Each structure stands twice: as structure tokens, then as C-alpha cells.
């Protein structure tokens, strides 16, 4: 059984490491994979590793559907991106997607965003 997860017990790994062990060791066959916010368990670096796993899965003939708030996972090349607006799914590009734009705004204006968020609204 341990060989199915890379030879290490899932209980001896962090949450993110156990997720990556599942992806890389158990989900190898061609299939349809559906994930709901996999980034919740994955560090930034493991999100990058997840992109590599996605490429390997797609190259093996798999299809992957992901609900995500991660600009890293959203950046998968040639991904078809949908956003829900007023209960309707609409296609969008990476650069136009609010997930990317919001993260970019934070990263490029971190100090201002933090100042505004943590300011005393009673002053």
C-alpha cells in the first residue's frame, strides 16, 4: 500500500505533501479528474509541481476540470478558463480573469493594500 503513495505513509507527510503523493503516485492513468480548489492543500511550490503533474496527466490523455482561486493553477497553458458571473459561466482569458488581476494588484501594491485593510475605519 505504501508504494501506492511513493513509499511514505500519508500520515507521515504534511497535508500538501500527501496531496502531491496522491497526484503523482495514484492518479497516473488516463481519466477525467475533477478538483475543487486543490490549492487549499498546496504551497506555492507544490502548486507549481501540480502544474507539472497536470501536464503529465494531459499528455497521457486525461481531462482535468478544476475550480480554483489560484492564479498559479489558472496559468496552465492553453487552459479554457470560465468565471461565474451572476450565475452564468463565461469564458475569459488569464489576463482578464479577476483571480489574476486581484493577485497582481496585491503584489504590486502590497503596502497600500495592507494599509487600507488594516486602517482604523473610525478615524
Label each region the model flagged.
Residues 45-63, 70-123:
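C-terminal lobe/lid and adjacent interdomain/linker elements of RecA-like ASCE P-loop ATPase modules
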Residues 34-36, 63-68:
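Structural recognition of the conserved hydrophobic beta-strand(s) that form the central parallel beta-sheet
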Amino acid at each position: 500500500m505504501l508504494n501506492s503513495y511513493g513509499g511514505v505513509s500519508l500520515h507521515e507527510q504534511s497535508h500538501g505533501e500527501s496531496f502531491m503523493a496522491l497526484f503523482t503516485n495514484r492518479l497516473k492513468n488516463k481519466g477525467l479528474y475533477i478538483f475543487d480548489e486543490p490549492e487549499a492543500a498546496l504551497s506555492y511550490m507544490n502548486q507549481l509541481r501540480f502544474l507539472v503533474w497536470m501536464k503529465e496527466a494531459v499528455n497521457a490523455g486525461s481531462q482535468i476540470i478544476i475550480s480554483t482561486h489560484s492564479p498559479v493553477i489558472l496559468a496552465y497553458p492553453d487552459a479554457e478558463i470560465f468565471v461565474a458571473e451572476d450565475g452564468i459561466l463565461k469564458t475569459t482569458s488569464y489576463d482578464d480573469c479577476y483571480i489574476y488581476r486581484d493577485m497582481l494588484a496585491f503584489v504590486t501594491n502590497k503596502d497600500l493594500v495592507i494599509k487600507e485593510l488594516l486602517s482604523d475605519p473610525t478615524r
